[in-house]
Amino acid sequence: LKAMKAMFMVLVLSLIGGYIFSLLHIPIPWMLGPIIVVMLAQFIYKGPLNWSGKLRDLGVVIVGTSIGVRFNIDLFTMLGSILFHMLLLNIILIAGSIGIAYLTSKWTKVPMKASVLGAIPGGLGQIVVFAEEEKVEEIGVISYFQVIRLLLVVVLVPFIVAGHAVGKQIVDAKFSLSLILLIALAWVCSYLMKRIHFPVSYFITPILLLITLQLFTPLTMPHVPGFVMAIAQLLIGAHIGLMLKPHMVKLPIRILIGGVASALALIILTFGSSFIMSFSMGASFATSFLSTAPGGLDQMVLLADAVHADISLVSTFQTFRLLFIFLLVMPLMKLFYRWREKKECIREQEANVENVNV
């Protein structure tokens, strides 16, 4: 009962936040409103606040379903040129992240390993699990760096791209039983993929499922109506709002400032690299920036949807970034640290041998 009350409290706060933000015509109001209101409430309200991870997953499945229905299959014919751009932009991003981490580590006196894990724009959950596996002590600092990046991206980026919205006549879809069945099917498939440790399963599975259904079945897919997308925004926003815990703000001031500075530097870096994409691929500014921005996959796609950017391109680029980090960058980091530990071990043994000889 207590847990239900804590969740109900977050739901009420999220609804208030979403409603206020939509009255103020702020971009993606039903995600930004809950994030800001729930986050601030943690510092004022002393009772328990809680949100189910399953509800957040449902929000992500809805976003994935919405993309899958509208995914531009023609993208596959352009994969060659897109792949080159995705690799180039991700190499710039990772090199930039490591550079930013180096400067942050020098200034905040946080060890380089923790600083890199704080700066790399992967998924927060996966980065923290990786840090625990690697026995990094500064888990709190890494979590703070990752959360502050997510929050700054989700709060600043909408205002950067809002002026670049493309005016499109929106035909709002009808809510139907077939849509409920489709979301349920996507959720079940995502859950099964999660069981076999498929990366970002709740997001990628619905997209793959719907692309497959569109390619191989004569079914017409129901579009996701605006109010269902607003529900998805709220389910995700409430979860993000609870991520910045009051105890995180008790970190040393240098680390607090370092986290904000490193997140802003990443946003500036991706803002710059988005012009490469815009120039060489002829994509709009909103599409390019949302494709490269170091935010959460689901949030960037919701934003792309709000400003009518090319969601197929944004979701492809953002998914590639996460997979690039999970499947290539992290294993390479593991190998690098193993090699360094071995080297240090050998050095220590040699030093010991010398001491014995002396």
Predicted regions and their residues:
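Membrane-interface helix termini and inter-helical loops of multi-pass transporters
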Residues: I73-I82, A162-L177, T217-G226, K250, ...
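Entry/N-cap segments of selected transmembrane alpha helices
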Residues: A6-L15, F71-Y102, L179, A230-I231, ...
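Alpha-helical membrane segments and immediately flanking helix-loop junctions
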Residues: W107-I148, A283-Q318
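C-terminal transmembrane helix pair
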Residues: V154-F159, S280-V358
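Structural signature of hydrophobic alpha-helical transmembrane segments
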Residues: F21-I36, R56-G59, I82-L93, K113-I120, ...
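Intrinsically disordered, low-complexity non-transmembrane regions of multi-pass membrane transporters
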Residues: L1-V12, M112-A114, Q126-V128, E137-Y144, ...
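Core mid-bundle transmembrane helix pairs that form the ion/substrate translocation pathway
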Residues: L11, L15-S22, G163-L219
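Hydrophobic transmembrane alpha-helices of secondary-active transporters
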Residues: I35-L79, L209-F216, G226-P252
